[in-house]
Swiss-Prot record:
NCBIfam families: S18. One of its GO terms (biological process) is translation. PROSITE patterns: RIBOSOMAL_S18. Belongs to the bacterial ribosomal protein bS18 family. One of its GO terms (molecular function) is small ribosomal subunit rRNA binding. Binds as a heterodimer with protein bS6 to the central domain of the 16S rRNA, where it helps stabilize the platform of the 30S subunit. One of its GO terms (cellular component) is cytosolic small ribosomal subunit. It holds the Pfam family Ribosomal_S18. The lineage of its organism: Bacteria, Pseudomonadati, Pseudomonadota, Gammaproteobacteria, Pseudomonadales. This is Small ribosomal subunit protein bS18. InterPro entries: Ribosomal_bS18, Ribosomal_bS18_CS, Ribosomal_bS18_sf. It comes from the Bacteria.
Length: 76
């Protein structure tokens, strides 16, 4: 049976020495939201718990201000 090589996950925010995640930085936030609009969990992205909490808050703020969609367009 062949074993698959699993890439080591790392926290992008720690590597870039980010102090605070901004809700106006939509390109960063979109990378952590799935196609259906759900926030991607840290066990998949490798984000540390501190930044995952900041990320969730920033995504929720951006959604509230209509900068990000709550869900996908449902393909109508």
């Amino acid at each position: 049976m062949a074993r698959f090589f699993r890439r080591r996950k790392f926290c992008r925010f720690t590597a870039e020495d980010v102090k605070e995640i901004d809700y106006k930085d939509l390109n960063t936030l979109k990378a952590y939201v799935s196609e259906t609009g759900k926030i991607v969990p840290s066990r998949i992205t490798g984000t540390k718990a501190r930044y995952q909490r900041q990320l969730a808050t920033a995504i929720k703020r951006a959604r509230f201000l209509a900068l990000l969609a709550y869900t996908d367009s449902h393909g109508r």
